[in-house]
Design a protein with these regions (language model features):
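Conserved, mostly hydrophobic/aromatic
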Residues: 2, 24, 61, 85
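Short, well-ordered beta-to-alpha junction loops that form the rim of enzyme active sites
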Residues: 4-7, 63-66, 97
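Sec/Tat-exported extracytoplasmic proteins
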Residues: 6, 55, 65, 86-89
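Active-site glycine- and acidic-residue-rich loops that bind
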Residues: 6-7, 34-41, 68-78
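His/Asp/Glu-enriched short active-site or ligand-binding loop at hydrolase and phosphoryl-transfer sites
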Residues: 8, 12-52, 89-101
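Amphipathic, non-transmembrane alpha-helical secondary structure
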Residues: 44-53, 75-83
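C-terminal domain-boundary segment and adjacent tail
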Residues: 69-107
């Protein structure tokens, strides 16, 4: 699997990736954790609280655990995010290999 930088794909990049055996996986809108936004305006706790309110079943999450635009890396929020989602009844699984080999994710 692969994720296009910025989530931007074209028909050509998707064809090229498929020819190389890759399936593009895009994150869900609620799955953008905001961790590339400036820390002074979007502190980790605010991003964590927003994620815990917004994420729904089946969402694919995307996080940069350390990025130049943040003075406070988001990585320390990963454990509270997973714990909070589990406390809300979420489960975590590996992506099924069979659906990836067919070039799509099964729902």
């Amino acid at each position: 699997i692969w994720r296009a930088p910025g989530g931007i794909t074209t028909a050509e990049t998707l064809r090229a990736a498929k020819a190389c055996g890759y399936t593009h996986i895009h994150w869900s809108p609620a799955g953008f954790l905001g961790d590339e936004l400036p820390s002074d305006r979007y502190p980790n706790r605010m991003l964590l609280d927003q994620a815990l309110r917004s994420i729904r079943s089946g969402d694919i999450l995307m996080a940069h655990l350390g990025i130049w635009s943040r003075s406070d890396p988001y990585a320390p929020m990963l454990d509270p995010l997973i714990a909070g989602l589990k406390a809300s009844g979420f489960c975590f699984e590996l992506l099924p290999q069979a659906s990836l080999s067919r070039g799509r994710l099964a729902r």
